[in-house]
Amino acid sequence: MKRLAMLFLALASLPATALAQSAHPQAPPYCFDLSRVVDLAVTKERFASIAGRPRPGDFRDTKLVLAGWKDCSLYGAATYTCDSAEMDTAEQADEARRDLLDDVKSCLGAGWAEVAERSSPSYVVLQNAARPVSITLSTDQTDSKRHVVRLTVFVRRN
């Protein structure tokens, strides 16, 4: 009888749940992991727990790849970076950067703001008021002449 009551309650709540989900756009699939990257940035170990194999220079692979992003890596001890999917034109990359900016801001919530004096039309800086962490979203051209949006999380050294 208890199981039947629980099943009924679950089924009765389905329309309300579906309505609530459709009323609010779904968070991008990388939100939880992006928040985790930001949280790791301010720990004593920084990104050591997600560091993978060494790459040329001072880069390392990362064990924490943001869903929908590619070529995620660590640079030094305090920088995490990922590229978006490649696009054909710079205009597409600019539009994607604007959309991703809105997504990232919604993922991270209050406390994050654009720093206009450090931003440009193709480069946006977000800073957290309470923690020494910044995020940049910039456009770049690959060696194969395609365009990407690059997300970079780094620890500010003020």
Regions found by a protein language model. Name each.
Residues 86, 118-119, 130, 139-141:
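A mature extracytoplasmic/lumenal domain signature
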Residues 143-158:
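Short, low-complexity, Pro/Ser/Thr/Gly-rich segments in the mature regions of secreted, periplasmic
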